[in-house]
């Protein structure tokens, strides 16, 4: 199966569909469009004429990056698409860096997916260089 990885072409309809396929619900379109517009970069993977995977990259474009909404459709998992997408994103970041310098890529793994990221070189927190990652949901009722 062939697939194509694209930078900054992710559309709201595909984002909403893939987001829901991960079991996270369907975000409102206006919120989705704003999130995509304000992302540092977006990535999509197309196979057989449809988008089957996506990710957003947030950050300052120089030193700090955060991987968000990394999704491969459940029926497309296990085919190397996620590995290829993550490798592509890492190379995208590498191209933003100054020679001899490293950027810091962080993420929050979906429960049960930690092993995938660890195989790709990510360290679980806490570890010898940092404490546990922390997060907080801010909700508008």
PLM regions: where:
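Short amphipathic alpha-helix that is part of the acyltransferase structural core
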Residues: 1-30
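C-terminal "cap" of GNAT-fold acetyltransferases
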Residues: 7, 99-141
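A short helix-loop-beta-strand connector motif used in the catalytic cores of GNAT acetyltransferases and
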Residues: 34-44, 101-103
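Conserved beta-hairpin
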Residues: 40-55
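A conserved beta-turn-beta hairpin within the catalytic core of GNAT-like acetyltransferases
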Residues: 59-67, 77, 100-101, 127
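Conserved acetyl-CoA pyrophosphate-binding loop and the N-cap/start of the following alpha-helix
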Residues: 76, 80-88
